[in-house]
């Protein structure tokens, strides 16, 4: 089997596929100016195009697919997409990242279709603070989705919270207590600077090392990562059912173990979340006979992948916001 690899000795077995660039939340760290979409942008990838895309990437060694947005549950054909992705031989894991606003009543169907992992965005466990961060009053709906996911015993269930110095870090102990009796993982993501959130970033950034130092002092132990795992370093504790984690893109050598590629909701391959430029794959997603051309295009494009991003130099590439590419 072919294994995708770049010039920096990194292998890629994990694909993040955005299903839409539209989001119905207005998180200050992502869309501080609201969402401004180009009305002339191409149509979203269709189900047949998605199927051809996944089959091609599996032939290149991809084992895990994460469906992101924007907000992927805004797609009415989401269950069909999950089913199509899960049905491709070679796919070991189908994951979904969602804000949970309209997820509770769809989870059973998604699980039956082949969903094996859910990452739920939840930046606060307090309704008022949640609304202040996200611009949404759907806190109860998100919590209901989380409890439903626990009840359904999804194989992997994680909560993502963007680490914010004044808005949720003071409530860190609430998150830690939340996993005491719940078999979930809560991961804190360092706030990342984009072209749109400069002021917000300056006010709210906090290094993830602040959290890990506390956790290690409290007896939390690091867990070895799977080869298809994302960038989080997770920690376990004998007195807690759940886990804690940190995604720290500003830490040294963050990119040296990169194992994932991104395809936008319009079919463009993006080599780095904070890079520049995209490579259109859509012309090779129209028919199975184009498979060899698709594989060749992906392999050629991978030669342009750089060793790492330049966030530490305040260079966000051409990333205006995270909703466009799914974070």
UniProtKB/Swiss-Prot annotation:
The molecular function terms in GO held by this entry are:
4 iron, 4 sulfur cluster binding; cyclic pyranopterin monophosphate synthase activity; GTP 3',8'-cyclase activity; GTP binding; metal ion binding; S-adenosyl-L-methionine binding
Which species is listed as the source?
Synechococcus elongatus (strain ATCC 33912 / PCC 7942 / FACHB-805)
Quote the function comment for this protein: Catalyzes the cyclization of GTP to (8S)-3',8-cyclo-7,8-dihydroguanosine 5'-triphosphate.
UniProt name for this protein: GTP 3',8-cyclase
Reaction catalysed? GTP + AH2 + S-adenosyl-L-methionine = (8S)-3',8-cyclo-7,8-dihydroguanosine 5'-triphosphate + 5'-deoxyadenosine + L-methionine + A + H(+)
Family in the record: Belongs to the radical SAM superfamily. MoaA family.
The organism's place on the tree of life at top rank: Bacteria
What does the annotation say about its assembly with partners? Monomer and homodimer.
A Pfam family (short name) is Mob_synth_C
Q: Which InterPro entries match?
A: Aldolase_TIM, Elp3/MiaA/NifB-like_rSAM, MoaA, MoaA_NifB_PqqE_Fe-S-bd_CS, MoaA_twitch, MoCo_biosynth_MoaA/MoaC, rSAM
Q: Which gene encodes it?
A: moaA
Q: Where does [4Fe-4S] cluster 1 bind?
A: 23, 27, 30
Task: Supply the SMART domains for this chain.
Answer: Elp3
Annotated pathway, please?
Answer: Cofactor biosynthesis; molybdopterin biosynthesis
Q: Where does [4Fe-4S] cluster 2 bind?
A: 255, 258, 272
Residue sites binding S-adenosyl-L-methionine per the record: 29, 70, 121, 192
Which cofactors are required for activity?
[4Fe-4S] cluster
Q: How is the cofactor bound?
A: Binds 2 [4Fe-4S] clusters. Binds 1 [4Fe-4S] cluster coordinated with 3 cysteines and an exchangeable S-adenosyl-L-methionine and 1 [4Fe-4S] cluster coordinated with 3 cysteines and the GTP-derived substrate.
Q: Where is the Radical SAM core domain?
A: 7-232
Q: Which UniProt keywords apply?
A: 4Fe-4S, GTP-binding, Iron, Iron-sulfur, Lyase, Metal-binding, Molybdenum cofactor biosynthesis, Nucleotide-binding, S-adenosyl-L-methionine
Q: Which GO terms describe its biological process?
A: Mo-molybdopterin cofactor biosynthetic process
